[in-house]
């Protein structure tokens, strides 16, 4: 949709998903190959489905059966667009270049479509950024999740490193917000289950993202590791913190944090 007049020009693109009146059906099998037994994917596997809508993929690999291809395809085709969904769809377009598509055995995005998807993601995220530098979930100030900001900033940094024209004002505003929050103790996650874990995980993620542009305060990272690492209930926050410490110059603490993760 384009509106042009009175000194203003606005372009907007909207996806209008069209699908059957029934939900999608996913059927999968994982097998260990026997060199003496042939393997086949019989027609019965699609019984009860609409033949024209069936998409079948068989992969033989020595790697664990992690469904990267279907995950990327699902993200690209997802019809909704909150801040998290917009970022995840943008990540799918970022990752699905020609070489990755060939590696996964799936149709890729040509350069034009990939650029359009990335620019669409940048524009939508820019419209969702609020005055604080965080991002609203649906484009207004009604719901803001501070824990989402490091994820969005990481996407913007990855896209910039890949050569895309990331809006610098959006990126710098979000980086400044992460820096201020990290120095001030981060989001508090009041009323949430596992509050201390969420707080630590968010600070560690923010520290990792800031360390990619050499803007993570080393003293704050050290204090997080020395005093709060016990709050982490999973390994990923410790890995994030370890990478941040290493990139900011404290390789000893960084190595220990990664090992503990």
Task: Provide a role label for each language-model segment.
Residues 1-197, 203-225, 240, 244:
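Extended, solvent-exposed functional surface patches
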Residues 120, 256-259:
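Primarily a tetratricopeptide repeat
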Residues 223-234, 261:
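Solenoid-like repeat scaffolds
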């Amino acid at each position: 949709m384009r509106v042009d007049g009175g000194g203003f020009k606005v372009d907007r693109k909207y996806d209008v998903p069209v699908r059957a009146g029934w939900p999608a059906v996913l059927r999968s099998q994982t097998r260990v190959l026997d060199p003496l037994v042939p393997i086949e994917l019989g027609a019965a596997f699609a019984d009860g489905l609409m033949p024209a809508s069936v998409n079948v993929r068989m992969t033989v690999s020595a790697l664990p059966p992690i469904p990267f291809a279907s995950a990327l395809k699902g993200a690209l085709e997802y019809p909704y667009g909150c801040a998290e969904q917009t970022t995840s769809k943008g990540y799918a377009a970022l990752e699905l270049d020609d070489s990755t598509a060939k590696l996964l055995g799936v149709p890729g995005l040509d350069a034009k479509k990939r650029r359009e998807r990335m620019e669409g993601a940048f524009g939508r995220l820019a419209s969702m950024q609020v005055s604080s530098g965080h991002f609203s979930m649906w484009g207004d100030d009604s719901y803001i999740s501070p824990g989402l900001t490091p994820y969005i900033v990481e996407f913007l940094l990855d896209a910039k490193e890949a050569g895309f024209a990331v809006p610098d004002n959006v990126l710098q505003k979000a980086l400044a917000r992460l820096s201020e929050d990290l120095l001030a103790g981060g989001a508090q996650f009041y009323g949430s289950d596992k509050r201390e874990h969420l707080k630590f995980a968010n600070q560690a993620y923010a520290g990792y993202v800031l360390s990619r542009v050499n803007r993570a305060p080393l003293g704050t990272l050290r204090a997080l590791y020395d005093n709060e690492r016990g709050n982490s209930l999973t390994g990923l926050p410790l890995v994030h913190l370890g990478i941040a410490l290493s990139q900011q110059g404290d390789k000893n603490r960084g190595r220990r944090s990664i090992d503990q993760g």
